[in-house]
Amino acid sequence: MFKRKKYNRAILALNEFIERYPAIPSTPYAYYLRGVITEEKSASILDEIISDSAQRDVQSVHDAYSYFYLLIDKFPNSKYSEEASKKLVVLKNILARHEFYVALYYTTNGSHIAAINRSKYIIENYPNSLSVADGLHLMAQNYDAINAEELAQDARTVLYASYPNYSPNYKIDR
């Protein structure tokens, strides 16, 4: 089913397998495969239209993250847990980047408080992600836009103390 891109049916079959056989030797693989299929599902739906997966609906990314997390939680010593951990890092970066794009959208539309809150969310919930620096930079810009100079300077201080060679890799369309 997976190879024929029948993702939903494959996930349902894996859910049934996991429920029926919660602790046999192949169960960790079922957890892993469920995460892989969900990750693939999130990537394939809009690949030809939007190349950056963070700009799409990220529900499947959230689901894949949950499935890999469950695998690691239930079977920490499984041979699939190490690979699942690597996938969690990638998925977290996608989720953080998605939040950044939402903050950027708010900035573009003049919703500066909403953009600041999204930037804070990135920093608090995805502290080791690749989007933290952009989030801090965007936060400073939005604080400037509402004349909160001290808060803008605080954000810049943290940004350049943490990322001394930072250069923005995004553009605000106004």
Which residues are covered by each model-predicted region?
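Acidic, polar-rich low-complexity tracts and alpha-helical solenoid repeat scaffolds
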Residues: 1-174
